[in-house]
Amino acid sequence: MKSALFSRFFILLPWILIVIIMLDVDTRRPAPPLTPRPYFSPYAVGRGGARLPPRRGGPDSGPGRGWEKRNESRPHARPRPEPPLPTIYAITPTYSRPVQKAELTRLANTFRQVAQLHWILVEDAAARSELVSRFLARAGLPSTHLHVPTPRRYKRPGLPRATEQRNAGLAWLRQRHQHQRAQPGVLFFADDDNTYSLELFQEMRTTRKVSVWPVGLVGGRRYERPLVENGKVVGWYTGWRADRPFAIDMAGFAVSLQVILSNPKAVFKRRGSQPGMQESDFLKQITTVEELEPKANNCTKVLVWHTRTEKVNLANEPKYRLDTVKIEV
């Protein structure tokens, strides 16, 4: 009996071993990744956990589709074009002297950093000088070169200076805009011996009619300025004749171009004008004190200085035996 069992066992043993080996090999093979089947709920969760019903109708709806937000593109409105930047017209009287080119160079270096500025340079001469012509050609600035001589009788000490030159600049502006619609612009008188902060040009560009601000190193004081209360000019802090209608320096105001064009007879006067009264005589023709627009933080910041170049000492300049090279200074 036992021998029969052992014989059957040994007959089945190889087959059992083969089955075990096959099962072991099959279990060692990497199982394919399980791909979860998508589940579409008939309800979608909205903000705050609220359950939203499915969308019905429309090309994107269908059985098994949940609610989804469509990001439909809408045409954007075109931005409005920015208004043109007002042009600043700077009228600069100048005359021949040893420091002329140095003064103009300093001024040009400032103007070159100001956007939309047109320089009107007016020589006190019967003709344009080669020095100024060459200088403007290399200055890299939009400019106009004018000339008009001061009559000999008005060159005496104590009389107003640069009257004819400023009037020539005003006449050029009016003639240029006579037959065309004037673009926004601002005019100011920039003497070639002044020093300007770039912030001043930002302030004056928003001038509606006539704007004013302090001036440093003028009138025998560290500064002069309009006195302002509640945004209005009520007086003048000045070291000379505070009774003037406009006790202000030529470097202390700017005028809208439209005001200049609307007052074609407004000029600087020779007859009847007293020394130091040119600013008042001019401004009386175009505005009143009540209409003045204070700039520079209600006229509490100095952004322009009435600097003066020291008189040059040329005592050692030779009259004979000159340099063999002619150099422009």
Swiss-Prot record:
Its cofactor is Mn(2+). SUPFAM superfamilies: Nucleotide-diphospho-sugar transferases (SSF53448). Residues 45-87 are annotated as: Disordered. The chain crosses the membrane at residues 3-23. It catalyses: 3-O-(beta-D-galactosyl-(1->3)-beta-D-galactosyl-(1->4)-beta-D-xylosyl)-L-seryl-[protein] + UDP-alpha-D-glucuronate = 3-O-(beta-D-GlcA-(1->3)-beta-D-Gal-(1->3)-beta-D-Gal-(1->4)-beta-D-Xyl)-L-seryl-[protein] + UDP + H(+). Keywords: Glycoprotein, Golgi apparatus, Manganese, Membrane, Metal-binding, Signal-anchor, Transferase, Transmembrane, Transmembrane helix. Its main location: Golgi. It is a single-pass type II membrane protein. GO terms for molecular function: galactosylgalactosylxylosylprotein 3-beta-glucuronosyltransferase activity; metal ion binding. InterPro entries: Glyco_trans_43, Nucleotide-diphossugar_trans. The record marks 224, 316 as: Interaction with galactose moiety of substrate glycoprotein. Its EC number is 2.4.1.135. Residues 24-329 are lumenal. Residues 240-249 are annotated as: Interaction with galactose moiety of substrate glycoprotein. Pathway: Protein modification; protein glycosylation. Mn(2+) binds at residue 193. The active site is at 279 (proton donor/acceptor). Homodimer. Involved in the biosynthesis of L2/HNK-1 carbohydrate epitope on both glycolipids and glycoproteins. Belongs to the glycosyltransferase 43 family. This is Galactosylgalactosylxylosylprotein 3-beta-glucuronosyltransferase 2. The gene is B3GAT2.
